[in-house]
């Protein structure tokens, strides 16, 4: 089996219940999310801007092709997971980018997840109405 010379950088991102596996390959700036263009995958442009933030911040949007496989969650959670995956892959390319990315708050994983519903309550914290008499 012959090993290829193509360099690729991988990053894993998680947000809420979404998991994104990101692969950066030196190229022309092509982006595919689950084998589709981001404009065809995500419902609005703000989500795409949120997803592309690490590449725009480091001025590497035209340097790498981005291939993403993302599962679970909604569109905002998926965009956040992709953003973290891209950030981690970029740090593998050049370690000096980490300080700029950290200042923008992109390196830290957002660990907030939906709180579970408890029995005896209507939701995670909403209790039945209290009656005094």
Swiss-Prot record:
It comes from Ureaplasma parvum serovar 3 (strain ATCC 700970). The keyword S-adenosyl-L-methionine does not apply. GO terms for biological process: translation. Belongs to the universal ribosomal protein uS9 family. The lineage of its organism: Bacteria, Bacillati, Mycoplasmatota, Mycoplasmoidales, Mycoplasmoidaceae. This is Small ribosomal subunit protein uS9. Transmembrane segments: none annotated. GO terms for cellular component: cytosolic small ribosomal subunit. GO terms for molecular function: RNA binding; structural constituent of ribosome. The keyword Lyase does not apply. HAMAP family: Ribosomal_uS9_B. Keywords: Ribonucleoprotein, Ribosomal protein. The gene is rpsI.
């Amino acid at each position: 089996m012959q090993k290829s010379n193509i360099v690729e950088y991988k990053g894993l991102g998680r947000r809420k219940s979404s998991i994104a596996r990101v692969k950066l390959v030196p190229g022309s700036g092509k982006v595919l999310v689950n084998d589709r263009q981001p404009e065809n995958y995500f419902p609005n442009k703000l989500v795409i801007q949120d997803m592309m933030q690490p590449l725009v911040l480091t001025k590497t949007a035209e340097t790498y092709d981005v291939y993403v496989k993302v599962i679970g969650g909604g569109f905002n959670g998926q965009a956040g997971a992709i953003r973290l995956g891209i950030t981690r892959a970029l740090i593998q390319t050049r370690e000096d980018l980490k300080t700029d990315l950290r200042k923008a708050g992109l390196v830290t994983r957002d660990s907030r997840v939906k709180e579970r519903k408890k029995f005896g309550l209507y939701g995670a914290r909403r209790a039945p109405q209290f009656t005094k008499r």
